[in-house]
A protein has these predicted regions:
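Intrinsic-disorder/low-complexity signature in envelope-associated proteins
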Residues: 2-119, 123, 127-128, 481-495
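An alpha-helical repeat/solenoid feature that recognizes helix-turn-helix modules
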Residues: 80-120, 134-166, 179-219, 223-278, ...
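Active-site-surrounding "flap" and adjacent substrate/cofactor-binding loops of secreted or lumenal enzymes
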Residues: 164, 168-174
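Active-site-adjacent helical/loop segments in soluble small-molecule enzymes
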Residues: 418
């Protein structure tokens, strides 16, 4: 029931209510025996010049910990018995509800074509889920991304007839591979991505089992943060052995920061959460270039500008000069789904035996093309555009105005057109045959097409996944955690007393 501040019922308003009864979910005790994730995200080149975002999704990843993983979690209680799950404050608002998606689509530039593409993607993910609840190949990370994709559409276990069981199996997979004692989830990038998914899942379901897993996962993430504000691979808290300096990796920091923000909005508890959020702002500032842009492990102006800029927006620092300059650097960016075709063709010409020590086909192809590629084409001079544009699309959305409308005008039709579709491939909850759709860049990364499908679908749900960080609805929090807010500005983070 909606009440006004202080407890008084809002006058002269008709409030439509619905009695929610607990819905029994099938017994989930018989879960297939867990197999250790067999493949993890590979390393790719990251640090690149401006307008040529080529990114690494991961690097060397550790095996699963020696300690025993947590036992099978207790079966989910029907989440419909829990207080309304759509409580995420600030940028999340209540825009993922079925009744508000249409309004948000019209308000921010989405339409029937984008929503149809999203539904095809969700059905493709459902169809391609493995029996243990995961997605290949980097099973933990891809499962985290898939969960975030379903949640962005407002799909929840216990409520979504068509996708509820899919999400439930995915969440149970993450909880099953998590170390019961330490909270560690196997993998490198996998841990912060999975933590992000668990935190957001708790915020939307209030399920106590998910809460336990999310809070445990937060612990190694927060403890792995450097005094300088950043993170490095595997959340290693120690400085580099050779230089004695802390390696603050903007790409890795991006997933850590998103996980912290999701934890904050879900009101999860960790005594170090507030400080970690404030300190993370300093970490991104450390990697900001004086004239704008964010680098890999230090100041730079490359594709990671979108990562640093979005994270500063999400962490309440969009009015900081580093964030504003990052947006200026991105003014010349043009959205595109596809990898740069000539780069791929050039790589195909290079034989492995022709490579010298420390050379890769990618580095050689880049070097060759640098002599001929005109500057205006270098935006597409990348194998992993979706990694950068996942962040860039959100940056533009939060920036709003003509910046967003101009971006969306190009992004929306390009992404819808780029989706591959199989007709009548799966039945929906009503038994009707429906199409499935996916996205896949033309390179050889092992996590295609799951990663591309999730990142592209998330961009096509930006219209209702978030409220712009500059909107009045987004900035007025019920409980102000980091600092005070106003009706017109982002929540400000005080970074001066750490």
């Amino acid at each position: 029931l909606l009440v006004m501040e202080g407890g008084a019922v809002a006058p002269d308003r008709v409030i439509e209510t619905q009695v929610l009864e607990a819905e029994e979910i099938k017994d989930l005790d018989k879960i297939e025996e867990f197999e250790k994730p067999d493949e993890q995200i590979e390393d790719m080149d990251i640090d690149i010049p401006i307008n040529s975002p080529n990114v690494s999704v991961s690097s060397d990843m550790p095996a699963a910990p020696n300690q025993p993983v947590s036992p099978q979690p207790q079966a989910f209680e029907a989440v419909m018995t829990v207080k309304s799950p759509v409580i995420l404050k600030n940028i999340y608002g209540t825009t993922r509800n079925t009744g508000t998606r249409g309004t948000q689509l019209a308000r921010f530039g989405g339409d029937r074509t984008t929503e149809d593409a999203v539904m095809r993607a969700l059905r493709w993910l459902k169809k391609n889920q493995l029996t243990d609840g995961s997605w290949k190949n980097s099973k933990v990370a891809m499962t985290g991304l898939a969960i975030l994709t379903f949640l962005a559409h407002g799909e929840k276990p216990g409520e979504s007839v068509e996708f509820g069981e899919t999400i439930q199996k995915a969440l149970e997979y993450l909880m099953r591979v998590q170390n019961k004692e330490t909270g560690r989830i196997p993998g490198n990038y996998d841990h912060p991505i999975a933590t992000y998914a668990l935190c957001e899942a708790y915020g939307m379901t209030l399920n106590p089992n998910v809460k336990v897993a999310a809070e445990k996962a937060l612990d190694p993430l927060i403890k792995g943060q450097h005094p300088t504000g950043g993170w490095t691979y595997n959340m290693d808290p120690a400085p580099d052995k050779d230089t004695g300096k802390y390696r603050d990796d903007t790409s890795y920091m991006g997933w850590c920061a998103q996980a912290l923000k999701a934890a904050q909005l879900a009101k999860l508890h960790h005594e170090g959460l507030d400080k970690a959020i404030k300190l993370a702002v300093k970490g991104f500032k450390k990697n900001a270039a004086p004239n704008g842009g964010f680098g890999y492990c230090g100041p730079g102006t490359g594709g990671l500008t979108s990562v640093g800029t979005l994270c500063m927006q999400l962490l309440g620092a969009s009015n900081e000069p580093e964030c504003k300059k990052g947006l200026q650097v991105m003014e010349t960016w043009v959205p595109s789904f596809s990898s740069y075709g000539p780069l791929i063709e050039e790589m195909k010409k290079i034989r492995k035996e022709d490579l010298k020590e420390n050379q890769t086909a990618l580095s050689v192809a880049k070097s060759r093309l640098a002599k001929t590629v005109p500057p205006e084409e270098r935006m597409f001079y990348t194998l992993s555009p979706q990694y950068y544009y996942y962040y860039a699309t959100q940056c533009k959305f939060h920036q709003g105005g003509k910046h967003w409308s101009n971006w969306n005008k190009v992004m929306k039709p390009a992404y819808v057109k780029a989706q591959a579709v199989t007709k009548d491939a799966i039945k929906n909850d009503k038994g009707l045959l429906c199409d499935v759709g996916w996205w896949e860049n033309a390179d050889v990364h092992s996590d295609r097409p799951v990663m591309d499908t999730c990142l592209a679908a998330l961009q096509l749900m930006v219209y209702y996944r978030y409220l712009p960080t500059t909107s009045k609805e987004a900035v007025q929090a019920e409980e102000e955690i980091t600092a005070t807010s106003t009706d017109t500005e982002d929540i400000k983070v005080d970074t001066g007393n750490l």
